[in-house]
Every structure is written in C-alpha cells, then in structure tokens.
UniProtKB/Swiss-Prot annotation:
Protein's organism: Oryza sativa subsp. japonica (Rice)
Function: Catalyzes the biosynthesis of ethanolamine from serine. Decarboxylation of free serine is the major source of ethanolamine production in plants and ethanolamine metabolism is crucial for the synthesis of choline, phosphatidylethanolamine (PE) and phosphatidylcholine (PC), and thus for plant growth.
Signal peptide range: none
InterPro entries to which the protein is assigned, alphabetical: Group_II_Decarboxylase (IPR051151), PyrdxlP-dep_de-COase (IPR002129), PyrdxlP-dep_Trfase (IPR015424), PyrdxlP-dep_Trfase_major (IPR015421), PyrdxlP-dep_Trfase_small (IPR015422), Pyridoxal-P_BS (IPR021115)
Source organism phylogeny: Eukaryota, Viridiplantae, Streptophyta, Embryophyta, Tracheophyta
Similarity remark: Belongs to the group II decarboxylase family.
Cofactors named for this entry: pyridoxal 5'-phosphate
Protein name: Serine decarboxylase 1
Binding residue positions for substrate: 200
A single BP term in Gene Ontology: carboxylic acid metabolic process
Molecular function per GO: pyridoxal phosphate binding; serine decarboxylase activity
Domain of life: Eukaryota
Modified residues (N6-(pyridoxal phosphate)lysine): 312
Length: 482
C-alpha cells in the first residue's frame, strides 16, 4: 500500500530552527546548546509552481528529512546541566507534536484510546521473553506467565484446546505472517503460496524471503479474494500442495475473504489433504468474533494458523501481535538452544516482554463484553462516516464486516498528510477505531467538504471516477452520479 503520511519529524522541523534554533514555545536559552533538529532544504523540483501534488517515493536514496542530532556532551555538562535541559526541551516539543498529530489520526488502524499508567512501575525492568513461551529458560526476567495467559485467551476465541495449540506474542503483525507462512512451507516444502493481490505486503515479503513460488489471485471489487480465479490458478498447479493466505480484513478496503469458500474451492479442486491456510487477521481478526452473524475464524475448520496485531484494535502502545498455530506443526520448526536452556520456534530471538503484560492488562479490563461494545461502536461510526460522505456527494464504500471506509482521494496532499490518510491510486481510507468519535469524524468531514469545494470550484478539473475501485454503485462522479 502506498502511504501518504509524512515523517513526523518534519512537523517538528517546522517548529524548530536547524542549528541552535528555537522551537515554538521553547525558551531560547534552553535550546541554545548543541541539540539540533537537522532538516535539509527541499529539492528544487519540489518547490514552486508546477510541482507534483503527490510525493514521489524514490528507493535507494538515504534522504534524511529531519533528525535530532546526537552529539557528545561538553566537558562541563555535569556541572551546568545544559544538556539535560536541552533534551528535556526537545522531548517536551516532541510530546506536543504527538498530541497534535494524534488529534488528526484517521488513516491507520491504531486504537489510541488507552491508559496504561498502572504499568509504568514495570518500565524499570528489562523484560525479555526469550525462546519458547511454554518452556522455562535460564533467563528469569520474563513475562511468560502473562504471555501464556494471553495466548490461552486467543486460543479460546479461535476454538483450539490448550493442549492442541502453540503460539507466541510477536513483535508485530508482519512477524505473525512470516511465521504462519513459514509453518506452511515446513508442512509442505514444495507448496505454492497463493495470496490475493490485496494481501498485505508482508505476505509477498515472506515469499521472497523463503524463495517460495507465489501466485497472486485476483480480487472482487470489494477487495475479497476471487475464488473463481483462485480455482483456475489452483488447477494450473494441481501437482503441488497449496499454502494460502486468507485475509481477515485487507489493508486498503478492509475486505474479509470467504474462508469457507476458499476451503470448498480447495477440496473440490482435489487438494483435500494438501493445503495449509494461514489467516492474516491483523485488524479484523479480533473484531470478527464480536460481530453478530459474521463467519467464524475457527480451528474447527481446516486452517493452520491465525495471526493478529496487538497494537491495532486492542490498543497496545508498542507494536506487537499474536500468532497461534496447531501444536502438531511446530516441531518442524523447533530446535534446542543450549544457551537458553530452552527450545525455540519463533522468528525473532529476543522478544518484548512488556507487550504481553499490556495485552493481558487490556484483555482483563475489557473482557468479551467490552470488546463487543467497542466493535459495535466502530461499525456504527463507520456507517455514519460513509453515509455523511455520500450525502456530501463523495463516493464511498464500506464492506459489510468492516470499519474501513474507502472514499475519493483528497486532491490536496497537505490535507492527506494533516489527517494521516492512507492512499492508493484514486482512493483513500479512514479506519474507524474505538478512539475515533463522532465529533472527530464531524471535524474531518466539515474540513474535507470545505476544502473540496475549493479544489473543484473553477471547473478546470473534476473529482475522479471511482467505479473501478469501489464499484459503480458507490461512485458519485459526473458519469455515475444518479
């Protein structure tokens, strides 16, 4: 997915002068030491008239848009305390920037409504969950008792008994996908990976890392996998097992693949005992269980693994995730590590031991009913946003089981960056999370409609047609508007 969010430090760069400069609200004497925000001038082609409205992303170029310099303390710094004062000023400025950016956070699926003040006392400890969560190692400063409690909770949600699952808390959602696909590859070493074109980029990263043959499957207009195309491509490779990534909420459109139809397609195609399914539930994997009449993601079905992100719907302040697979598969990956006096079947080595505690804390505070209320609120507010957009004459789409509202990409990239909207081609989206209130949506909608009126007021250009992206019924361009 092509993102449109600027480096947060750029905003700070606007609030501080590069060398011995002064940030907004900062006393000159507090910053007049060697604490710098380094921000190089913009390339000439980005300035002046005729510059492109969309930023060009150039790979292979180490461009430092902004940075806080790291410099050696002065010899007398312990006596003067200037260094500490300068760092405190930079951190205060950065915090104000975070507060401001959080007010305009809509395009990425992070729940910013949390309070973990009670856990501050644990920040004094280096908590590291090395190795297998279920095996005690020589390292004693860990949180595996919290980790296993969290894993048991997710195993219950996905209907897998304690003695039948294995899992761990990952460092991010991508790691869950890397692990799930790796397990599939170990179960079927010559298997082909199938994933819809709208799968998260980490799925295709896994294919490159593991040097797997990968087949991209077409999608429906909703973003859901096209099982007719899936069937055609399966039959072209019927001599090799299938490893399938099933999306429980695609990145851009929030589409949920039809798991039951995927399984039916595999079985009818002659792959009954020759497939492994990994479910990427980064965001909606934890929302779907609380949606009435939604299809179940369950290990009672022939799936191999499920992963979710912990920093998205749950609202953990640091990136993390949960990966659950069947115990019968894990020995193919596991190996003894004498250094740890444990076994290891994870992707990473050291793992954040604080994350399981944050997850455990939230799961205990909210419980099943709490999450159910938050899911209902998100879906209700997402429908509100979609309806308001359409009332304003802006094409929009909302999938049935989703809180991701897809709509016409704003013409002004400054507006995109201000609201941190995720964009792809002619579309952008807002992901309605528990922290997104009706008031915030109204604020966004009012600003969008006001700005949009100026973008198209002279008639020199028209809003883009979204029919190919969201379907004719959801497009409100001059051609499809009824």
């Amino acid at each position: 997915m092509v993102g449109s969010v600027g480096n947060g430090l750029v905003d700070l760069g606007g609030a501080a002068v590069a060398v011995n400069g002064v940030g907004k609200g900062m006393r000159p004497e507090a910053v007049a030491v060697a604490m710098e925000v380094e921000s190089p001038p913009r390339p000439a082609e980005e300035e002046g008239e005729g510059s492109p409205t969309r930023r060009e992303i150039v790979l292979g170029r180490n461009v430092h848009t902004a940075s806080f310099a790291v410099k050696e303390p002065d010899a007398d710094d312990e006596e003067t305390g200037e260094r500490e004062a300068a760092m405190a000023s930079v951190l205060a400025l950065y915090r104000r920037n975070l507060v401001e950016r959080t007010k305009h956070h809509l395009g990425y699926p992070y729940n910013l409504d949390f309070d973990y003040g009670a856990l501050g006392q644990l920040q004094h400890f280096s908590i590291n969950n090395l190795g297998d969560p279920f095996i005690e190692s020589n390292y004693g400063v860990h949180s595996r008792q919290f980790e296993v409690g969290v894993l048991d909770w997710f195993a219950r949600i996905w209907e897998l008994e304690k003695n039948e699952y294995w899992g761990y808390i990952t460092n991010c959602g991508t790691e869950g996908n890397l692990h799930g696909i790796l397990v599939g590859r170990e179960v079927f070493p010559d298997g082909i990976l199938y994933a819809s074109r709208e799968s998260h980029y980490s799925v295709f990263k896994a294919a490159r890392m593991y040097r797997m043959d990968c087949v991209k499957v077409d999608t429906l207009i909703s973003g859901e996998i096209d099982c007719e195309d899936f069937q055609r491509k399966l039959l072209l490779n019927r001599d090799k097992p299938a490893i399938i990534n099933v999306n429980i909420g695609t990145t851009v459109k929030g589409a949920v693949d039809d798991l039951d139809l995927v399984i039916k397609t595999l079985e009818e195609g002659g792959f009954k005992d020759r497939f492994y399914i990994h479910c990427d539930g980064a965001l909606f994997g934890l929302m779907i269980p609380f949606v009435k009449k939604a299809p179940k993601v369950s290990f009672k079905k022939p799936i191999g693994s499920v992963s979710v992100s912990g920093h998205k719907f749950v609202g953990c302040p640091m990136p993390c995730g949960v990966q659950i697979t069947r115990l019968e598969h894990i020995n193919r990956l596991s190996s003894n590590v004498e250094y740890l006096a444990s076994r290891d079947a994870t992707i990473m080595g050291s793992r954040n031991g604080h994350a399981p505690i944050f997850l455990w804390y939230t799961l205990n505070r909210k419980g099943y009913r709490g999450f159910q209320k938050e899911v209902q609120k998100c879906l209700r507010n997402a429908h509100y946003l979609k309806d308001r957009l359409k009332e304003a004459g802006i094409g929009a789409m909302l999938n049935e089981l989703s809180s991701t509202v897809v709509f016409e990409r704003p013409k002004d990239e400054e507006f995109v960056r201000r609201w941190q909207l995720a964009c792809e081609g002619n579309i952008a989206h807002v992901v309605v999370m528990p922290s997104v209130t009706i008031d915030k949506l109204d604020y966004f909608l009012n600003e969008l409609t006001e700005k949009r009126a100026t973008w198209y007021q002279d008639g020199s250009c028209q809003p883009p047609c979204l029919a190919k992206d969201v379907g004719e019924e959801n497009c409100l361009c001059s051609i499809h508007k009824k």
